A protein has these predicted regions:
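Beta-rich carbohydrate-recognition and catalytic domains
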Residues: 1-23, 31-78, 85-274, 283-311
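C-terminal structured domain segments
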Residues: 278-280
Length: 311
């Protein structure tokens, strides 16, 4: 699935700040849809404030951006929007709706759109207290990994044939070390790969692999701590991860994942620091486009980077 013998190099060729109108702009995702770019992220007072809304920006060229919409729910903190490209041509958005002043409760919600600008009303999906982080379609079904937001901690795999009615597929996908955020991709041969963040014990990330019907998973400890993981498989089979790395200076970075060797290797660090992470990855016009957020320039803002790969 990958080409580990080829030495890859990467260079950040451009970086633009595209989201900075709120005191705290963060938790991004990126997609190309109907010939346009769309970038979604949360706007709020702070990282953990209870006033989060989802801003969706759009662009034709990735350089000049305008607001497509703002999604808000009264009395609710909307967090971590994630795009899902659907086989029926619609664009889907997943997020968590957090409520409660002292003890927060989390419910995954979703919206659907035919143009990326107008979005239907929110629909609750999955189960209360299990945050469906990312989802991807394969062979007429959508799969999403959710994680428990309170004890007992676990990760769970869901399956849906319409992207809305999420059914438990693997109730206990992973349990040890407080598993939570994840990236999920499918190879052309149907193999599923899941990059899973953990925040307890050794806190080392796990790489899961499964073949259809995705009931049985094998896991490899990658030996490195990551945050905000996402996965992208390039046309040549190279598997990339966008993550926050904690060794040395905290940074958002692009890494190569070798599933056979169980290795995650940093390829290039993006201009970032402090409160930073949650990249979105898109391969377009032979470039890797990366949305992410960072506070290295002071206020926490959203950036778009272009990364060229050689080798």
């Amino acid at each position: 699935m990958t080409s580990p013998t080829r030495r890859r190099t990467a260079e950040v060729t451009a970086v633009r700040r595209i989201g900075d109108s709120a005191p705290h702009s963060a938790f991004t995702d990126l997609v190309r849809y109907s010939g346009r770019w769309f970038c979604a992220f949360r706007e709020a007072r702070t990282h953990l404030s209870d006033d989060g809304v989802i801003r969706v920006l759009t662009s034709t060229d990735g350089r000049s951006w305008t607001s497509a919409t703002v999604i808000a729910q009264a009395g609710t903190d909307l967090r971590d929007p994630r795009f899902v490209a659907r086989p029926d041509g619609r664009l889907q958005l997943l997020a968590a709706a957090a409520t409660g002043a002292v003890t927060k409760t989390f419910q995954t919600v979703t919206w659907l759109s035919t143009d990326g600008h107008a979005w239907g009303g929110p629909t609750q999906v999955g189960e209360p207290g299990v945050w469906v982080w990312r989802a991807a379609w394969h062979d007429d079904a959508m799969y999403g990994v959710g994680y428990a937001t309170r004890e007992p901690r676990f990760a769970r795999l869901y399956r849906s044939t319409d992207g809305v009615d999420l059914r438990q597929w693997v109730p206990m996908l992973f349990e040890d070390g407080y598993p939570n955020e994840s990236g999920l991709v499918f190879a052309p041969d149907g193999t599923a790969l899941c990059l899973l963040r953990r925040d307890a014990g050794t806190a080392s990330a796990q790489l899961g692999r499964a073949v259809p019907p995705y009931r049985d998973w094998t896991w490899t400890d990658l030996g490195v701590q990551v945050g905000g993981p996402t996965l992208l498989r390039l046309p040549d089979g190279l598997l990339l991860a966008g993550v926050r790395l904690h060794d040395g200076e905290v940074r958002t970075a692009i890494c190569v994942v070798d599933p056979d060797r169980g290795e995650l290797t940093e390829l290039v660090a993006l201009p970032s620091g402090g409160d930073t992470s949650y990249p979105g990855l898109v391969w377009h016009d032979d470039l890797l486009w990366v949305s992410y957020y960072s506070s290295h320039e002071g206020r926490t803002c959203v950036y778009l980077a272009e990364v060229s790969l050689t080798g």
